[in-house]
Curated annotation (Swiss-Prot):
Gene Ontology annotations for the cellular component aspect, listed alphabetically: cytosolic large ribosomal subunit
Protein name: Large ribosomal subunit protein uL18
Protein family membership: Belongs to the universal ribosomal protein uL18 family.
Pfam families in alphabetical order: Ribosomal_L18p
Gene it is expressed from: rplR
Organism encoding this protein: Hydrogenobaculum sp. (strain Y04AAS1)
Amino acid sequence: MKLTREEKRIKRHRRIRKKISGTASRPRLCMYRSLNAFYASLVDDITGNAILTVSSLGKEYVDATGKRGGKSIEAVQKVAEILVQKAKEKGIDKAVFDRSGYLYHGKVKAFAEKCRELGLIN
């Protein structure tokens, strides 16, 4: 039976997760892209806790942009700015990027490049 796009993404994500893991000092920066919003989290895989989570539906994003739920590249870049700012406040200056099985193109690429520009990932 042929795999759906989502099943292929999950398969890629599992393959990536075998090689990538985050610690408390350098957490894993994972993301999720839905049709209506964009979510990003910093995760410590040793304890299994999410250190920090930001989305385009969150209060910080709504306060900064004046609208709820953004799915454009500009919205994704704003989510990256908020995430990096909150990470710096918590004392996190480096993270490992996990593209969650999504192709490195469009919103995923814009998010990663903005985080790189702001110094969170290499």
